From Swiss-Prot:
Mg(2+) binds at D72, D74, D76. Gene3D superfamilies: Phosphoribosyl-AMP cyclohydrolase. This is Phosphoribosyl-AMP cyclohydrolase. SUPFAM superfamilies: HisI-like (SSF141734). Homodimer. The gene is hisI. GO terms for biological process: L-histidine biosynthetic process. Belongs to the PRA-CH family. Keywords: Amino-acid biosynthesis, Cytoplasm, Histidine biosynthesis, Hydrolase, Magnesium, Metal-binding, Zinc. Signal peptide: none annotated. It catalyses: 1-(5-phospho-beta-D-ribosyl)-5'-AMP + H2O = 1-(5-phospho-beta-D-ribosyl)-5-[(5-phospho-beta-D-ribosylamino)methylideneamino]imidazole-4-carboxamide. InterPro entries: PRA-CH (IPR026660), PRib_AMP_CycHydrolase_dom (IPR002496), PRib_AMP_CycHydrolase_sf (IPR038019).
Length: 105
């Protein structure tokens, strides 16, 4: 099992829908939120703006049940496949990635 490199404090964490591979969101984990994710089976993140841990869906009910956790080649970025309940984005959209900048290159 790979060890996640938390030497910089936070690691970017990409959340994918386990059913269709859609990118749902990007958040950050520190060692404590990562450990809570492993212990509970649901995503926990570190809020940079509030400087605290948060459990995705704790207040909204839009939870993320973890199916798989992957790390990149440098062990400093995570990719987590989840079963998403409700929308992932705080705007009410399924994914946080809904603003197309350009296509057809």
């Amino acid at each position: 099992m790979n060890t996640v490199d938390f030497s910089k404090g936070l690691v970017p964490t990409i959340i994918l829908d386990d059913q269709n591979g859609e990118v749902l969101m990007l958040a950050y984990m520190n060692q404590e939120s990562y450990q809570k994710t492993l212990e509970t089976g649901y995503t926990w993140f570190f809020s940079r703006s509030r400087n605290e841990l948060w459990n995705k869906g704790e207040t909204s009910g839009n939870t993320q049940k973890v199916k798989q956790i992957w790390t990149d080649c440098d062990n400093d970025t995570l990719l987590i496949r989840v079963i998403q309940t409700g929308p992932a984005c705080h705007t009410g959209k399924k994914s946080c990635f809904f603003n197309l900048i350009k296509e057809d290159f």
